[in-house]
Every structure is written in C-alpha cells, then in structure tokens.
Amino acid sequence: MTMPARGVARLLSGTGLAAALLLPAAVPAQAAPPSRLPAADGKKGQELPGMPSALDPDADAVSCTPASREKAKKQDWSRQRLDLDRLHQYSTGAGVTVALIDTGVVPGAAGLDGRVTAEGTAGDDCVGHGTFLAGLIAGAGDGGPRLTGVAPGAKILALRGTDERGQASAGLVTQALREATEAGADVVAVAAALPRRDTELTRAVADARRAGALVIAAATPDPPRGGTEDIPARTYWPAGEPGVLSVADMLPAGVRPDNAPATSGIDLAAPGAGVVSGGPRGDGHYLGAGASVATAYTAGAAAAVRAVRPDDSADAVARRLTATAYPADIPQLDPYAAVTTVLGDAGAAAGAERAAKPVAVRDTSAADRATERATLFVLLGTGGVLAVLWAAFALPRARARGWRPAAAGGTGSSTGGSVED
C-alpha cells in the first residue's frame, strides 16, 4: 500500500513538532501543571492546563479537576493530522452510539449538550478525563477553532469504569461493558488498560462482540503520576482480548513517546500527545495525552465508518480501519480513508492480517547484497565479451602488418587502423 502524498506531507510537517512537545502528566488534579500546545512552526505554542487521567489516590480529600480558564486559539495538530474537516463532508457518525467507559461524562459540558446519556453515577465526572475523551469522539467544538470531535453526529453513552478518583478496576470495567451491551452500543471505547487478565472481563468482551459491538481499548496505561518500581506488563487488558482493537498513542512525528510502556499486539496508532479538548466545568480547554486519547479518536473514526456502512460487521469495520491506515511499524489511523476508500477482497484480507499482527519493517539487506553481486557478474561478463570482439578484429590486422605498429598520420583513429599510401 502506497502512502498518499498528503500523508507524506503530514509526517514531514510533524517531525519538527515532536521536540517542542511537553506531555501533560497525570498528576493530582489540584496540581496539574500547564502544558504547551505544539505550534505549527515547531516552536512552543500556547500554554494550556493538563488533563489528568486520575486523581491522587493518596490524597486525604478528593479535589476535582478545576475549570480551565484558557481557550485554545487554533486547531491542534491531531485534528489536522486526522483531516477532520474533510472527513465531515462524508460522515459525522450520525445515528451511531459510542459507549465510553472511563471516569464519566458530564452531559451538559461545553460542546456535548444533547449528545450524552449517562448511566448511574457516570454523569458526575470529578476527574474530567471521560468528558475530555467524549469531546474527542463527538464534541461539537462550540467556542473553539474547529475543535470538533471525529464524529460530532454520534451519541455518547457514558459509563463509569473507575472510582471517583479515576482508578479503574476489572469489576467496574466488566459491569460497564455489560451495560454497554444491554444498551446496544455500536462502538465501545475502554480507556482503562489493566495489567492482569480477568475471567469475567473476558466474558463481557466476548458478549459485547457477539452482540455486534466493536470494542476498542487502550493498548497501554496513560502516563503515570510518578515513578514506579513495577515492571510494565507485556499485555494489558481488555486490549489483549481476541477481537478487541488495541490502540496506542503517537507523537506528531508519527512515533510513540519515549516513556511509553512496552507492549505487544498493537493494531493501530492515533494522536495521543498535545491533544486539545474540553472538560466537565466551564468552557476552557485542556491538553491530554496517552493511549486513552488515541482510543477516543479511533472510536470516533469507527462511528464515522459505521454511520456510512451500517451493514458492516464490527470485524469488518476493524479491518477497514487497519487496512486504510497509513503504513508504518504500527499503522496510523486515517478516518477519512476509512470512510471513503473502496476495498476489494485483497484489501480486506490485508487489513485482517494487519489487525492480527503488528506490521514489521522488512529487512532488505540480503536482497540488496544479492542484487549487487548480480550486477557485478553482468559487468564482468560484458567486459569479457567486448575483449573477445576486440581480439577478433585487431589480431588479423596486426598479423597482416607483420606485427608492426600502425603508421601515424592517417585519417583514421589511432585505434581503428590507418589509410596506407
């Protein structure tokens, strides 16, 4: 698959941004440090507060994430990379329901009014992370410079997969998955990445898939609050479950962050650093980071696809998302291509294989050496043929002259004989 010219341009333009990017850390909400919005010229841009993925679990009292007083002045790099302005000419995700399992979503938050249904306590989002992700999926972008979500026509079903402080557990995620299945969600986005597999969670994922939902989950946890002595798990759950689309975060340069946990089985990469969205209180903006952000973008893309291809199965949508992604070590999400590309059987098969196994860079060094040897043999063979032809021409003439040198001053060339008097 050849990368489109516009894709090459995006990758090149993003390279200079990575050096200027400061990732927002998931620190206690009351002390969340500001982060910089990457500027188009690669310099440090506007400063916005960071959105934590969880609150400090050791704090004596719960202090919710405060409202941001800052508003983004421009469209961020991630929306430009995903080409949302162009995508929305073909699909807005209308008629599709995305279940978001995270810290909850405030239904009346800026840009989300009329788009959110919250189950149980999920309408109260103290952390703000779930509301932030909902804006990336289906936000209207009210009051911002084209800061819409990937599928602004979709509906959000907010489900709580964490406690009040944003700490996820297998039990809460399992319960939320079952509620999403009962509600008939078309797409399920799971922000949590749990280090251990859970039997009930495995069953809940299988039930959701049998009901026709496309389950999308973060391949790794979001940036931690601080250092840890724990050895990172090689597989996180439910992203590691069969049939779940596992999503990782990438920087503007198209690579994963240096501090990203190592994991296997990643299906897609999507923007996951320096991403702008709103929060549960006020109309200000934050910067978010991590695989959960990339998962939200991918869930929005899945909603956009399901809106225009309602008869496609969840597996077919997953294949389409991977088959139309930008080629890379980890295929990079392209919502516009996923919605508009016409895939044949070969393309679908390629997408299925890519979804099952991450793409590897092919080593061509052996083939290159073989080509060099073949070229050398051809050159040597050609030289031998020319030598034989020269001998067949020159030796009879030299014998006729009695092996004397050719006379000088002729009109012919020195190597081509002479005209005798």
Tell where the protein language model's regions lie, with residue ranges.
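Secretory targeting and sorting signals
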Residues: 1-33, 378-397
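Protease zymogen maturation seam
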Residues: 2, 14, 24-95
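Subtilisin-like serine protease catalytic core
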Residues: 86-98, 105-116, 123-169, 262-265, ...
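Loop/turn elements at helix/coil->beta-strand transitions in domains of secreted/extracellular proteins
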Residues: 94-97, 153-155, 183-188, 210-215, ...
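Solvent-exposed loop/turn segments at secondary-structure junctions
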Residues: 103-107, 142-143, 162-166, 193-197, ...
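Substrate-binding/access-modulating region of protease and related hydrolase catalytic domains
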Residues: 163-237, 293
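Extracellular S/T/G-rich loop segment that most often corresponds to the catalytic His/Ser-adjacent loop
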Residues: 236-307
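C-terminal subdomain of the subtilisin-like protease fold in secreted/lumenal serine endopeptidases
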Residues: 309-421
